[in-house]
């Protein structure tokens, strides 16, 4: 069944200025509405390298919900376990500046509780033959528990990402059961109740190694934008992965693509976490 991706679907509404962006002022621009959501993005990214993932999630019982399913199927994602329910999709509204960076965003989360029943009814079918599991950690606690239970039952590795660290912080006890957790520098600061925004990669690497060891988290990767990424394992192994220079057009989904690549590498390729992060 390949990699199973579990999480929420969002509709992204994005605004781009036509001239110099004025914070707090009126800006003429253009608007885009696209399918989004961390896990949906991850499933599509994995499918784009021909790995045929399975997406487990919810969509609205509407034409927009069917559009999401149709697009995933066009990318060869297995959509058998997507359930149509009222309020099945969230909304993410973001404003971008002239550099392609998000200057402000607000999101409305969907009701993901129907996933609990879906996993209870079809969990064995979903997880028994999968290669690994990519999990959005800020789902309902019961959904995370169910996923980890099935992973243990069938001996599957679980890799986790977040879309809202404020919610995911309430799930931090589960991180000891996650084979690799990926987040950005700001999210890592929230997780460990500290401010890491000023840290350079060398210092971030040392701090992360200490935190991962003390919290007994098996493996963690922290992305740092243009500074690259750092990783650490509970056994003391850690390192820095320099960034590759690219022309930025839109940073939306960059972290999702990084996570998808990490999951693909850890699932399909027998190389170490440094080479995977590259």
Identify the function of each model-found stretch:
Residues 3, 194, 198-278:
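Conserved phosphate-binding/catalytic region of the ribokinase-like
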Residues 125-126, 173-174, 213:
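Structural alpha-helical scaffold elements that stabilize or flank donor/cofactor-binding regions
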Residues 132-204, 227-229:
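Conserved beta-alpha-beta core of the PfkB/ribokinase-like small-molecule kinase fold
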Residues 71-86:
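A glycine-rich helix N-cap at a beta->alpha junction
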């Amino acid at each position: 069944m390949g990699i199973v991706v579990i999480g929420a679907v969002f509709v992204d509404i994005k605004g781009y200025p036509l001239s110099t962006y004025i914070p707090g002022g009126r800006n003429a621009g253009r608007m885009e509405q696209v399918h989004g959501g961390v896990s949906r993005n991850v499933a599509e990214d994995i499918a784009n390298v021909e790995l045929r993932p399975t997406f487990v999630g919810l969509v609205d019982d509407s034409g927009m919900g069917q559009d999401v399913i149709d697009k995933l199927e066009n990318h060869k994602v297995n959509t058998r376990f997507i359930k149509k329910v009222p309020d099945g999709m969230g909304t993410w509204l973001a404003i971008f500046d002239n550099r392609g960076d998000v200057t402000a965003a607000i999101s409305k989360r969907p009701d993901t509780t129907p996933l609990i029943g879906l996993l209870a009814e079809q969990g064995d079918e979903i997880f028994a033959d999968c290669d690994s599991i990519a999990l959005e950690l800020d789902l309902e606690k019961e959904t995370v528990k169910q996923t980890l239970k099935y992973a243990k039952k069938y001996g599957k590795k679980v890799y986790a990402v977040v879309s809202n660290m404020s919610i995911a912080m309430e799930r931090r006890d589960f991180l000891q059961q996650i084979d690799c957790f990926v987040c950005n520098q700001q999210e890592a600061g929230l997780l460990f109740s500290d401010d890491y925004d000023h840290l350079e990669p060398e210092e971030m690497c040392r701090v992360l190694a200490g935190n991962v060891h003390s919290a007994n988290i098996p493996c963690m990767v922290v992305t740092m934008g243009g500074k690259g990424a750092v990783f650490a394992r509970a056994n003391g192994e850690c390192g820095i992965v320099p960034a590759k220079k690219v022309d930025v057009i839109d940073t939306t989904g960059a972290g999702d693509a990084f996570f998808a690549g990490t999951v693909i590498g850890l699932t399909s390729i027998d190389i170490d976490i440094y080479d995977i992060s590259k």
